[in-house]
Every structure is written in C-alpha cells, then in structure tokens.
A protein has these predicted regions:
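C-terminal region/appendage detector
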Residues: 3-197, 203-295
Length: 295
C-alpha cells in the first residue's frame, strides 16, 4: 500500500500479560517492546502536594536529558515530570515505567501489573500510563495519531468500554479502533478462516476464526502459559524430584542478579563463589524479588 507524504500513520498498541508492544501501522514489527509491569512507591508528602490532583490528565514531562515541551515552559507552578514516571493520585502511588522502572533496585519498590491472571486489563489507569510511555518511546504525540488497540478474543464488554474511554478521554486520540488480536493473527497469514493457537505468558488459547469473526463458544483456554512453565522450572530447580540422576544437582535457592555484588570463577560442580549485597536482602519486597527471579 503506497502512502501519500502528508498521510499520518496510526499507532498500534498490543498490550500483553508480559510485554506491551507498540509500533506504526504498515510496518512488519513493533518499534517498542516494554514490560507489562511497573514499579511503584508511595508518594511523598511533597509529591502529593505537587501532583496529587493530576490523575489521568497528567501531561508527559521532559526526558532525563532535560528536553522540555512548551506545556512545561508555560506551566511554572509545577516541576516537569521525567518520562518513565507517573503519579496515581487515587492510590498515592509513584509509578516507575519501562525497562528501567522494573530493573533498577529501589528500597521498598513493589512490582505490579494492570492485568489479571487471565491477561484481561483490570487497572486502566496504569495501562494509560504505560500507553503514554510507549508513545514517548515512539516519539509520537497521542493527539496527532490515530490509535489501533488490540484486545483478547474473550475481552468482556466492560473492558471494551474502558479501553475506548482510555483512548478518547485519557490519550485524546483523533481516531480509535479496537481490534481482536486473534483475527489480526489470522489476517496476517492471509487466512480469514483459521484455528489460532495463542501461547501467551498467562494462558494458552485455541480460538476458531470464521470469515474474520471469532466463534466465542468455540474458545478453549488453559492457564498453562509461559509463566506456568517458568514456575514449574523454578520448582524443579529448588525441590527434590525423586530420582536425583535426572538433574544431578539441586539448587538451594535462585539468587536474582540485583543481589549479586561480585562473582569469582569456580570449578564445575563446586558451589558458587559470590558476594551478595547484604544491604538489599531485607529491604527488597517479595514482589520485586519474585519478578527478577522469574526473568
């Protein structure tokens, strides 16, 4: 499809239970792939006074290199908010978004996700902040680009309405379309009628598509996605499973990378020679440690 020079491309957002992907319509692959998780800390009293009433209407601030938008120049009452950070006034949370938001260790940092165990969005405020972060990664302005947002085949009606509210009232996009990702997968293979097997992080689904429409009564799902495989692997590494000859060794515990201060080489079959960060052992939250253990 040939495009005119003055034509504005649509932004495609594909939020999954593990990764949220963003890119431009017509391209073969996404431009941005960010984790569907975010870190959060309680807002300080100063942050509550400055940003406690902004909520969904918060404007994106400058980058870490100091670039400032015209909105920030005109508004001298509040300091700009760095990209990758947002504030949830309703729950008094300071969110840390993107790879750096969930990778950098901070004292007391919790890890959360807007999705439930079935991959359905439950927290649209957090999804709005993540969507803003994806637009920033694409160097795109939501008010100037149409948005195509994907949804699972069994997305409830209430979630569809919330998604439209997020697009028009939260992001202020000029045009919006909510597309079934199962139908998009079938169309990408040139088949309007297909049986799509979707293996995701939270579950595995077998979904029939006929002439571009999903047969909802024929959907079969199992909660045995990639996360379940990772949990089973973690259990197998830390628990004895009858015949030790199967694995040959048993791990006492899995130590995440953020707890390792330094390492030394050791011979095969010998215990690891690592120095841990003792100061982080008791100030790390269970959610942060589990997230990095499963990576």
């Amino acid at each position: 499809v040939y495009k005119r020079q003055d034509e504005i491309n649509a932004v495609v957002l594909d939020p999954g239970a593990s990764v949220i992907r963003g890119g431009w319509a017509g391209e073969d692959q996404p431009r941005a792939m960010l984790p569907s998780f975010y870190g959060w800390l309680p807002m300080t009293d100063e942050e509550r006074n400055l940003y406690g009433t902004e909520g969904l209407k918060q404007e994106p601030g400058p980058t870490q290199d100091g670039d400032v938008s015209m909105n920030d120049v005109e508004n001298h009452s509040k300091p700009p908010v760095p990209r990758g950070i947002s504030f949830d006034a309703s729950r008094a949370r300071k969110r840390f978004l993107g790879d750096s938001g969930v990778s950098y260790w901070r004292r007391g940092l919790e890890i959360d996700t807007p999705f439930d165990e079935n991959g359905i969005v439950q927290d649209f405020d957090s999804l709005h902040a993540m969507s803003r972060n994806v637009f920033d990664a694409l160097c795109a302005e939501p008010t100037e680009n149409p948005l195509l947002l994907t949804e699972p085949a069994d997305n409830p009606r209430a979630a569809r309405g919330k998604a439209a509210e997020l697009a028009f009232e939260g992001l202020n996009v000029p045009a919006f379309y909510l597309a079934n990702r199962t139908v998009l997968s079938a169309f990408s293979s040139g088949r309007p009628t297909a049986l799509v097997v979707d293996v995701g992080a939270s579950r595995v689904s077998a979904i029939p598509v006929v002439d571009g429409f999903v047969l909802r009564k024929g959907i079969h799902t199992q909660p045995n996605g990639g996360d379940a495989v990772s949990r089973a692997l973690l259990w197998g590494l830390t628990h004895e499973m009858g015949d030790k000859n199967i694995t040959g060794w048993l791990a006492d515990s899995i130590v995440p990378q953020f707890l390792v201060k330094s390492k030394q080489p050791c011979d095969p079959g010998m215990p690891a020679k690592a120095t841990l960060r003792e100061d982080r052992l008791h100030s790390t939250t269970p959610s942060f440690r589990m997230y990095h253990t499963m990576q």
